[in-house]
Regions:
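N-terminal leader/linker segments that initiate helical-solenoid repeat arrays
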Residues: 22-55, 59-72, 80
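Short solvent-exposed coil/turn linkers within tandem alpha-helical repeat scaffolds
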Residues: 24-28, 58-67, 94-105, 131-141, ...
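Conserved small/polar residues in nucleotide/adenosyl-binding loops
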Residues: 225-232
Length: 232
């Protein structure tokens, strides 16, 4: 009898850890925990790590609203990781959820993806379908810089200058870059005094110090020629 009781106790003792392990595993992989894990990693900008739990969550029978949000994080992660199919994924999300509150940002992300591809006309069309002022400050500044650069690339220097001036007034991060491109635009417009005023402070800038001496020398030469011509 004692042997039977001992065997029964041993059997129960062996089963308890297995049951607890199963419960723990189920808790970890439950839909709500997968969503929370993916979202936390996404907010930490750990996009590669965020995708597996979010994908697993989406494949399960999940809350409709949470599924929409999880799919939003997935397509944004694809953009951040420069997935070659990111544009298609972002567009598909808009087709699936046309009333999403994230539409404005997704249009901006598609525009940015086109910008990085060098497709400036498409980027401009999408940037102009977005309200960049509604984005977070850092992302707004990044995309305003891309917008201004797109205008410069397609030869619309007037709009490029407007956007570079706008960004320069609000973003210390892009102040020198904007000064350089504004000065370059003024140089191409033969507004040499304005161009020189912008180029001179950039002579010690790590990014532009190799470029600006050429323009400064050219401007001085043009101003000297203009002065000599006036004297004649």
């Amino acid at each position: 009898m004692k042997k039977k009781i001992s065997r029964l106790i041993c059997a129960v003792a062996c089963c308890v850890p297995v049951a607890l392990q199963a419960q723990t595993s189920e808790k970890i992989t439950s839909p709500v925990n997968l969503y929370k894990e993916g979202k936390e990693l996404f907010l930490q900008k750990n996009y590669a790590a965020a995708m597996p739990p979010l994908r697993t969550f989406v494949r399960q029978k999940a809350d409709v609203n949470l599924k929409e949000e999880a799919e939003y994080m997935l397509v944004c992660s694809a953009y951040e990781l420069k997935d070659r199919n990111a544009i298609a994924q972002l567009r598909n999300y808009l087709d699936t959820y046309p009333d999403t509150p994230h539409a404005n940002r997704i249009y901006a992300l598609i525009a940015s993806a086109y910008f990085y591809q060098g497709n400036y006309d498409e980027a401009l069309a999408l940037f102009n379908s977005s309200r960049l002022d509604l984005l977070g400050n850092e992302e707004r500044d990044d995309m305003t810089y891309q917008l201004a650069t797109c205008y410069l690339k397609v030869g619309n220097v007037k709009e490029a200058a407007i956007w570079f001036e706008t960004l320069k007034a609000s973003s210390p991060k892009y102040a020198n870059a904007c000064s350089y491109y504004i000065s370059y635009i003024r140089y191409t417009q033969k507004r040499y005094d304005e161009a020189l005023k912008g180029f001179l402070p950039l002579q010690d800038d790590a990014k532009y110090k190799a470029l600006v001496p050429y323009y400064i020398a050219e401007i001085y030469a043009c101003l000297l020629y203009t002065s000599d011509a006036a004297d004649d």
